[in-house]
Amino acid sequence: MKQMRLWGFLFLSSFCQVSYLRANDVLLPLSGIHSGEDLELFTLRSSSPTKTTYSLRKDFIVCDFAGNSIHKPGAAFLNLKGDLFFINSTPLAALTFKNIHLGARGAGLFSESNVTFKGLHSLVLENNESWGGVLTTSGDLSFINNTSVLCQNNISYGPGGALLLQGRKSKALFFRDNRGTILFLKNKAVNQDESHPGYGGAVSSISPGSPITFADNQEILFQENEGELGGAIYNDQGAITFENNFQTTSFFSNKASFGGAVYSRYCNLYSQWGDTLFTKNAAAKVGGAIHADYVHIRDCKGSIVFEENSATAGGAIAVNAVCDINAQGPVRFINNSALGLNGGAIYMQATGSILRLHANQGDIEFCGNKVRSQFHSHINSTSNFTNNAITIQGAPREFSLSANEGHRICFYDPIISATENYNSLYINHQRLLEAGGAVIFSGARLSPEHKKENKNKTSIINQPVRLCSGVLSIEGGAILAVRSFYQEGGLLALGPGSKLTTQGKNSEKDKIVITNLGFNLENLDSSDPAEIRATEKASIEISGVPRVYGHTESFYENHEYASKPYTTSIILSAKKLVTAPSRPEKDIQNLIIAESEYMGYGYQGSWEFSWSPNDTKEKKTIIASWTPTGEFSLDPKRRGSFIPTTLWSTFSGLNIASNIVNNNYLNNSEVIPLQHLCVFGGPVYQIMEQNPKQSSNNLLVQHAGHNVGARIPFSFNTILSAALTQLFSSSSQQNVADKSHAQILIGTVSLNKSWQALSLRSSFSYTEDSQVMKHVFPYKGTSRGSWRNYGWSGSVGMSYAYPKGIRYLKMTPFVDLQYTKLVQNPFVETGYDPRYFSSSEMTNLSLPIGIALEMRFIGSRSSLFLQVSTSYIKDLRRVNPQSSASLVLNHYTWDIQGVPLGKEALNITLNSTIKYKIVTAYMGISSTQREGSNLSANAHAGLSLSF
């Protein structure tokens, strides 16, 4: 069992008394299997004053040590002095710790100094048992440039199921530049007693101020680990940082009492390139995924997702001091849950905490987060839970929500700031110069049952709220209850049925001050008015010009609402006073009621804003009335010129299929003799593109597929060819959202007759092209269309190879006459605002004229043929594709012109053919430059067998 090449370097005498290695630098090779049959000879000790290096050539397995009754640290490796290194001497180096049981810390390794694992093909810690870490150090613990690391099914009756950093001085645990996966699976830290707490199911640091860092790695996974504090990682007095990792970092189904996945003082996610996922982690008490004093998320390009995590408080995150999320990519909190009103997604209990959410270059979204009335209640039972995203229990020192232009913070679940205080919540603070985005409170994603209960859509902020810039939108029937509201800039927009209200015991200082009010048209099906209400002694002051806000193109293109008069309203009510004029005046504090004409795309008309005739001092109603003119202006993006243009995609596919079959050599039985039958086939690729700098609607077409066919000789100089080509293609245009995918089938028949130098040829091709298009309209819906293009192409041509006296070199002028006719069938789209497209037709008569330089090396068993040709192509007669279209719902009709292509082109082609016995390999590359900056290129290759 013992196969260990170590005896020339040290003598292992007993477990308690071992010969020590004493040298400045010690290098020890390791390989084979080292098992624990003899407990006294199992431990490998080192004490070099500088460093000890173990060099691994292949697998080295340390295993099967039953030392539960041994209470001295370090069963397999014990390093008492100097740094310890495990390095590779070959790319196959691997180190495994397996089935090692020890009644102390460090079942696999215990070191008083720094330990580094570097360059290993694999490092495995599996099925080990200790009272604190399989690998335990009082110095730095580093994993650098390894291919894979696996820690699985390890258990500790104390901190650190797999890895433990201990000691009184600040040290560090690093995972850096590892090239493969880092896996921590089903590790467990059991809470044995006060001196052996179960902190960190997989990784733990009980060394004060010691950082745990994962940087520049690939995939990282913590799954089904368990601990008392930190199901996966614990570092109460230091920082846990994930930075610049390139693939997914995942925490899945980890469990703890506090911090289902992570328990630390600082939890940092910096510059993550891959996604970072916290999924189905659970804490019996606080912090379903993360429990920390400080949480910082910034500069992460990948998505950050907290989904289906649960706890008593803080379903996803529980923070004591600072939660600062700066979203460079999407950040989502989805379906997390907590107990009571303790933060379905984020919970902050302490007074003086700081919460900053900034949608920088990515959106932040809270959706489906809940708080339950009973801890074990079923989450799908609607009577047992309330929607809630964030709960701030103590009065916060700072609370800010910011979004850059084009980005959003979306609360589809309410938030609660429970303690009354006068520290303002800032929306898009002036210190953030680019903060012109939207903060949205919405009930749009609630189920019909949950929309009936206001608690599921009411956000309570017991602070003054200040809107500095950008947009605050309250929509989908949501309610925002605040201590007071001051609009210093930006736009306050309310959707039908939504409400902004003060709450609590208000004084005369508490006001709702609005300078720019918007009507949000996000829910046209609702006729409920929006409401702005001031309770108790609070008042409302409103000024400025009202406006219509939202994804308004969805309204103006809505055939049901925009084609006829439409009204919506906002009620302003206060127990004390609503300050707003009944007619226009010069005072800047007065609300100017004006008429606004709409001249964009969709139905034309104007908005008129007016006061209700039943207004009082305590209640006023602003009514926005839409009056259409009856005219309609089509958005150019919906013209659909792309539809008839797809005939050019069919045309290019038809041409390449025909050119492959018309191979000058394979069709010439005098050059490549054919007696009975030839079968051939191979791949095909083509791309056609217009120069985007010279065409605003440049066309891009790509084909990829294959063909199969056969050649049959009718006589010694007459060959009939037939082929079937299948192409899969995609077509798109710049500045047009439409994009189609197609499957093209082409059948080709060709007849060739050769007399030494003279060759005559003719061909006929028929094609069926099935096109499918999908168009997604932001905030509107999706339309889909499918149609059929079909047609045929025929050609006749001749070529003459000379001089006759030179066998190996030929100059071959050629000329062809080609005619193509293609038809696009009419069709009707399905989905959002469908369009009808009539049929379109394209015909083209072209005359290619050119010359080829041929090199022929003909042998008895093998032959080589090379051909370079250039040709000028003139389209003699052309009917460009054109069509007409109409909107199905209002019958608005318009004409469509397909993208035209130039009528003159230059082509360069390179063909090569190699024949050996009955096998022939061929390849062709071609490029065509057409006037109007249209460039196409194609390539094909294949094999043929002759019989």
Swiss-Prot record:
InterPro entries: Autotransporte_beta, Autotransporte_beta_dom_sf, Pectin_lyase_fold/virulence, Polymorphic_membr_middle, POMP_repeat
Cross-referenced Pfam families: Autotransporter, Chlam_PMP, ChlamPMP_M
UniProt topology in membrane: Peripheral membrane protein
GO cellular component, one term: extracellular region
Chief place of localization: secreted
Residue ranges of every copy of the Autotransporter domain listed in the record: 672-947
Gene3D superfamilies with a match to the protein in the record: Autotransporter beta-domain
Coiled-coil ranges from the UniProt annotation: none
Subcellular location: Secreted, Cell wall; Cell outer membrane
Signal peptide residues on this chain, from the entry's feature table: 1-19
Keywords linked to the UniProt accession: Cell outer membrane, Cell wall, Membrane, Secreted, Signal, Transmembrane, Transmembrane beta strand
Family annotation (NCBIfam families): POMP_repeat
Similarity annotation: Belongs to the PMP outer membrane protein family.
Protein name: Probable outer membrane protein pmp19
Gene name, Swiss-Prot/TrEMBL: pmp19
